[in-house]
Amino acid sequence: LKKYFKGKTVITAEDPNLRSEKDLRSIGFQDVRRLPHSKSINIGDIKVTFYNFGLFLTDSAIVIEAGGTTILNANDAKIAGWPLKKIVRDHGPIDFALRSHSSANTRVCYKIPGDKSFVSDDREHYFRSFKLFMDAVKPKFAVPFASNHCHLNDDVIKFNSYISNPIELRDYVE
């Protein structure tokens, strides 16, 4: 990034966690601007809006509007219900919606003995979540992508079975 965008402004979501800003500054970006939740900035003919979800470990989604095309990149943010409806109402119709369909976290690797409320992730949960999200957004094009993990230690290699691919997602949705 720093090779191609040296001296350029970088815009990131404003959230309580300063990690993104610190990481960007650590690789040499000097002009890092944090955009508050639901506020927009125009960069030439491109309008950018961040939506932040969570209190301490913020998930962010970004809406990019340009030339009559609207892109919603939800990444792995857990947006649903009224907040998602508001985004679609404020920016819709959505042409391209991007969202993760596969988990990349450690929750599958542990159990909490005696805690009946603890639920480990399952592959179908992420497929179902992707479908519900796209049903709510109704984009012209749904773009699945996978967060990823790769467990290499013998004690946890079995958890690689939680990885899913877009073909499996398609089969689930159909």
Map each language-model feature to its residues:
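Structural beta-sheet core signal
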Residues: 10-12, 72-73, 99, 144
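Active-site environment of divalent metal-dependent phosphoester hydrolases
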Residues: 1, 17-20, 39-42, 56-58, ...
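Core dinuclear metal-dependent hydrolase active-site scaffold
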Residues: 34-105
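Short, charged N-terminal helix-start/capping segments
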Residues: 2-6, 67-79, 108-119
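Alpha-helix C-cap/termination motif
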Residues: 3-4, 27, 65, 90, ...
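A general structural motif
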Residues: 6-8, 68, 93-94, 139
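Active-site HxH/HxHxD metal-binding segment of metal-dependent hydrolases
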Residues: 1-36
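Cap/insert and terminal regions of metallo-dependent hydrolase folds
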Residues: 81-173
